[in-house]
């Protein structure tokens, strides 16, 4: 009996230390990535390991980090128009969007709607595994609060654009621009930026190089939203250019 208690005690001791260690690593990551390029994300690691485990050794999760100054302003505008139009104003969470999503999901459980902001998407893509669970969501809330506290909005947007998945093995806007349009991210047009943003809900299902009718329709909607937000002036007014 004593040995069993001792075993549980040791398990609790090392488990607690492990959790503290992981939290410390996350905190260090938030501080380091406030200034340095993010070399890879948890999503990239998950995709790469998944490919290897299924025998796809040709798969390479590819990303090329570029600063915001080397990204077309249309791209930053497009992702905000598509994913999070209140990004400059909220503190990491869009309460109105969350309430709307909860109401929708209660009425229609077959088509679940999300309400993640760009800040939340950045936090979970960099630091967390893919999937849906209350544990993961709780960790996402804490990490989102952390990056909102330490990083500027411009930094969050920069990291997001450099780690977002735009296709199979294609991460970050620089890799996407060169793969799909044979040009650097700095040269993307409004239409090209809107097309890239249009596939973000599910880049493994929706294709930039073979857009479905839905993707084209979403691209046109994003272009209209970019105009309604105020175009490049919107970025300048919120110090995001």
Curated annotation (Swiss-Prot):
It is a single-pass membrane protein. Pfam families: Transgly (PF00912). Its EC number is 2.4.99.28. The chain crosses the membrane at residues 18-38. It comes from the Bacteria. It catalyses: [GlcNAc-(1->4)-Mur2Ac(oyl-L-Ala-gamma-D-Glu-L-Lys-D-Ala-D-Ala)](n)-di-trans,octa-cis-undecaprenyl diphosphate + beta-D-GlcNAc-(1->4)-Mur2Ac(oyl-L-Ala-gamma-D-Glu-L-Lys-D-Ala-D-Ala)-di-trans,octa-cis-undecaprenyl diphosphate = [GlcNAc-(1->4)-Mur2Ac(oyl-L-Ala-gamma-D-Glu-L-Lys-D-Ala-D-Ala)](n+1)-di-trans,octa-cis-undecaprenyl diphosphate + di-trans,octa-cis-undecaprenyl diphosphate + H(+). The keyword Plastid does not apply. InterPro entries: Glyco_trans_51, Lysozyme-like_dom_sf, PBP_transglycosylase, Pep_trsgly. One of its GO terms (molecular function) is pentosyltransferase activity. Its main location: membrane. HAMAP family: PGT_MtgA. Peptidoglycan polymerase that catalyzes glycan chain elongation from lipid-linked precursors. NCBIfam families: mono_pep_trsgly. This is Biosynthetic peptidoglycan transglycosylase. The lineage of its organism: Bacteria, Pseudomonadati, Pseudomonadota, Gammaproteobacteria, Enterobacterales. The gene is mtgA.
């Amino acid at each position: 009996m004593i040995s069993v208690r001792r075993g549980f005690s040791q398990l609790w001791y090392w488990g607690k230390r492990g959790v503290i260690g992981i939290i410390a690593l996350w905190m260090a990551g938030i501080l380091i990535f406030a200034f340095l390029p993010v070399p890879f994300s948890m999503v990239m690691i998950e995709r790469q390991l998944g490919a290897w485990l299924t025998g796809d050794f040709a798969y390479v999760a590819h990303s090329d980090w570029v600063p915001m100054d080397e990204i077309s302003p249309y791209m930053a505008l497009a992702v905000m128009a598509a994913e999070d139009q209140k990004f400059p104003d909220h503190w990491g969470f869009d309460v109105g969007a969350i309430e709307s999503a909860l109401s929708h999901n209660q009425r229609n459980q077959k088509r679940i709607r999300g309400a993640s902001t760009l800040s939340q998407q950045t936090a979970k893509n960099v630091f967390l595994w893919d999937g849906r669970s209350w544990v993961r969501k709780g960790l996402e809330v804490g990490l989102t609060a952390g990056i909102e506290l330490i990083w500027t909005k411009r930094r969050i947007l920069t990291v997001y654009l450099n780690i977002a998945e735009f296709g199979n093995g294609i991460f970050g806007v620089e890799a996407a621009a060169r793969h799909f349009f044979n040009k650097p991210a700095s040269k993307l047009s409004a239409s090209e930026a809107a097309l890239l943003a249009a596939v973000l809900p599910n880049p493994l299902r929706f294709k930039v190089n073979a857009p479905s009718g839905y993707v084209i329709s979403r691209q046109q909607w994003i272009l209209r939203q970019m105009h309604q937000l105020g175009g490049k002036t919107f970025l300048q007014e919120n110090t995001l250019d």
